[in-house]
A protein has these predicted regions:
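SAM/dcSAM-binding transferase cores
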Residues: 169-222
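Conserved SAM/SAH cofactor-binding pocket of Class I
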Residues: 5-102
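Residue-level signal for inorganic ion chemistry
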Residues: 3, 91, 120, 177
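Mobile active-site "lid"/loop adjacent to the S-adenosyl-L-methionine
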Residues: 83, 92-126
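Conserved Class I SAM-dependent methyltransferase catalytic core
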Residues: 114-170
Length: 222
């Protein structure tokens, strides 16, 4: 939910891509936030659950799901990848260096096995519109690795460290990238706008006002 609520969607966005869509949650959040946009969700795993979720939602008519690697040749394997996207979002595989799990599905979800960071970067560079944004959420160590992989291609423009409670360390980073553009001064070494978000108060499973404000459109209990 955090990524879908935090990503910098704009009213003018018309095409949005969700990489590693899973159950389609983030894609549907994008459809809710961008009422004029067409959303495409892609995943190497089966997308039938995502399609069912979309069909049961008010936004199903603007959301399509494709079972296909985002690295696919657009002209031959995935016509959905033709053209550019105003916004790309991804909650990609992580734990790059940790041991793989015997369960292949769980391994794919938790490890950068089928979508190495350099291939994700290349796909974003290829598919992102000139003024587009790419939003991603990763554990802190993997976020640093991914930022390094993007140097020379994508510039980090915004970053939010996520803490579960005030006393816990930052566990996740929400990051937004744009195409590096030397002529406009947007470079990989340009300082991003940084902030922190604390999810819970640490008392009786209460959420902070900041987290409630960010996600209230997506939780009935808020």
């Amino acid at each position: 939910v955090l990524l879908g609520a935090w990503a910098g969607v704009r009213p003018a966005d018309r095409r949005i891509l969700d990489v590693g869509t899973g159950t389609g949650l983030i894609a549907l959040m994008m459809a809710q936030r961008a009422p004029e946009a067409l959303i495409t969700g892609v995943d190497v795993e089966e997308v039938s659950q995502a399609r069912e979720n979309a069909a049961a939602s008010p936004w199903g008519g603007r959301v399509a799901f494709v079972q296909c690697p985002v690295q696919a040749d657009a002209t031959k394997k995935a016509p959905a990848f033709l053209g550019k996207y105003d916004m790309i979002v991804s909650n990609p595989p992580f734990f790059v260096d940790s041991l793989t799990c015997p369960d292949e599905g769980r391994t794919t979800a938790r490890h950068a096995v089928r979508l190495p960071f350099d291939q994700l970067r290349d796909a974003v560079v290829r598919l992102l519109a000139a003024e587009g944004r790419f939003a991603v959420i990763l554990p802190t160590d993997e976020a640093r690795r991914f930022t390094d992989v993007c140097r020379g291609f994508l510039a980090l423009t915004r970053s939010t460290g996520v803490r579960t409670t005030p006393r816990r360390p930052v566990k996740r980073l929400l990051m937004e990238f744009a195409h590096e553009n030397v002529s406009s001064g947007l470079r990989s070494d340009s300082p991003p706008v940084c902030s922190e978000l604390v999810v819970g108060t640490g008392e009786h499973e209460q959420y902070t006002p900041e987290y409630r404000a960010l996600t209230r459109d997506f939780y009935l209990k808020f």
